[in-house]
Amino acid sequence: MWNPSAGPNPYPPQVVCPGGSNPACPPSQNPAFPPGPCPPGIPQGNPAFPPCRPPYPVPQPGCPGYQPSGPYPPPYPPAAPGMCPVNPPAPGMVGPGIVIDKKTRKKMKKAHKKSHKHHKHGKHSSSSSSSSSSSSDSD
């Protein structure tokens, strides 16, 4: 058998496999570096350099320059050219990351309504509750 003090290799060093004729002993090749179109300068298995991928950044889905190749429909509503689609804000959201409480929202709503009100000074003004709009009886 093999010598336990020889090291981690269970085969004695004098055993040489013929060039691939024995199915139990395939020709020596490193499975970490499979033959292929990968350039030899890029180390395989490095997450910074994925195997056989282009070194330039790949555009993200939904952004300009990206055409989805799958069966997925385009994002709705379609974004303007040159802009990525943005999700509509949830109710209560005013801007990106700004949430207003009910009290402040009510105050803002009131102020907004006020700014849209047309102040017409005349007979049909709804602000006056007195009946002075009718003609007076002084003859």
UniProtKB/Swiss-Prot annotation:
Alphabetized, the UniProt keywords read: Nucleus, Transcription, Transcription regulation
User: Disulfide bond: is it a keyword of this entry?
Assistant: no
> Residue ranges under compositional bias (Basic residues)?
103-124
Kindly indicate where the leader peptide sits in this chain: none
In the UniProt record, which is one GO cellular component term?
nucleoplasm
Q: Which domain of life is it from?
A: Eukaryota
Q: Where is the composition biased (Low complexity)?
A: 125-139
Q: Where is the composition biased (Pro residues)?
A: 24-62, 70-91
Locate the region Disordered: 1-139
Its annotated compartments are: Nucleus
Q: Does the keyword Cell wall biogenesis/degradation apply?
A: no
Task: Report the protein's function.
Answer: Negatively regulates TSP1 expression at the level of transcription. This down-regulation was shown to reduce taxane-induced apoptosis.
Name of the protein in its database record = Proline-rich protein 13
